[in-house]
């Protein structure tokens, strides 16, 4: 079993790939940002951790009211940005109760279309990431599809072919003995503070720090290709387990 596992992965248990196969990695690993080296240490790559706050939970009908992005390069957070966004509709009380953003807060804010190009520029060339990535990816994709930015050269975060790194998947794997996977509690267990939970830039910063901290665990692959491949496997296994538990 060990030999079969190594052969499928193309790497040693440390995540370092066999010599001479770097040119083959992209052919067998889906989900990579094509501009970035598959055999690079993922922690050294530019990573954009994205967090959105919204009017609800359905990306098809609800809208973004705040977006925060934290950028890491070489394993260090080098930039944080935040935008309040006017959703063009009232923010329901149940949504405001979570993120504390009200209609008054966004009445003079620009619509998403007005900041889309700026956001796309910041995300250019970066590995996209988010905590519970399916949520943020769905909302960001829905918003960008409504704008003229959708027709320009897409940043990796806007490409359907690119996998987002998801610290939640890794928290579920590496903190299996813990009941809560809420960002604040996962962060606290790693000694990372989150003072303003559910505000986009604070959540983005904390989630990126969580991913970098989890990445120091020896069970996390070192290279970008191996990380994406293993995250896919873990996400599928975790989804299967949740479905099984639902029917027990």
Predicted regions and their residues:
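Acidic two-metal-ion nuclease catalytic site recognized across multiple nuclease folds
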Residues: 2-40, 209-248
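Amphipathic alpha-helical interface segments
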Residues: 166
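Conserved non-catalytic scaffold segment of RNase H-like nuclease domains
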Residues: 2-161, 176-181, 185-198
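Acidic, Mg2+-coordinating catalytic module of metal-dependent nucleases/exonucleases
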Residues: 127-144, 173-247
